Amino acid sequence: MKEFDYIIIGGGCSGLSLAYELEINNKLKNKSLAIIEPRTDYKRDKTWSFWKTINHNFEDCVIKNWNNFSINISSKSHELKTKNFPYQTVNSDLFYKKINNELSKNKNIYLFKNVNEINTKDALIFNSAPESNANKSKLWQHFQGVEIETE
């Protein structure tokens, strides 16, 4: 069984972001990396939204920016401008394609999908898989909406 220098458990946003940053910053030169992901394929399965407080490498995956928002309570409304800290939404499909395209150029990076066992001997392991009690948070941000596409 092949041995790896690094193993990332979880090939979602966190795990793939870590692998991407290691690769583009030349930290994987002469190193092997295994990414373990339970899903069998990547598709647009979600969007990620956040306040942009620093520059990041995924501007080309951003599908929407908001520079203001409003807080509405009963009959009151207050609009806030956030030009310096826009709220951004990243499309997971664009993100997965960008990352996997870059990582596939390095023959020492292996993406294992739907794997039950891997040799972890002498490997540095990064576990980005959520803990089983991760959804017990008291604060949850959720948006409901409809996407409409027109020709």
Language model segments and positions:
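Beta1/beta-strand and adjacent pyrophosphate-binding region of the FAD-binding site
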Residues: M1-S14, A34
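Conserved Rossmann-like nucleotide-cofactor binding loop
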Residues: S14, D41, E131
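Predominantly flavin-linked oxidoreductase catalytic cores and closely associated redox partners
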Residues: G11, E21, N25, E102-E151
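Generic domain-boundary/flexible-linker signal
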Residues: R44, T82, K136-S137
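Anionic group-transfer/hydrolysis microenvironments
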Residues: I7, R39, A129-P130
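N-terminal FAD cofactor-binding segment of flavoenzymes
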Residues: S17, E21-S77, L94, Q144, ...
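A conserved beta-strand/loop capping segment in the N-terminal third of enzymes
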Residues: F50-K113, I118-D122
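Nucleotide donor/acceptor-binding cores
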Residues: F4, N30-K31, A123-L124
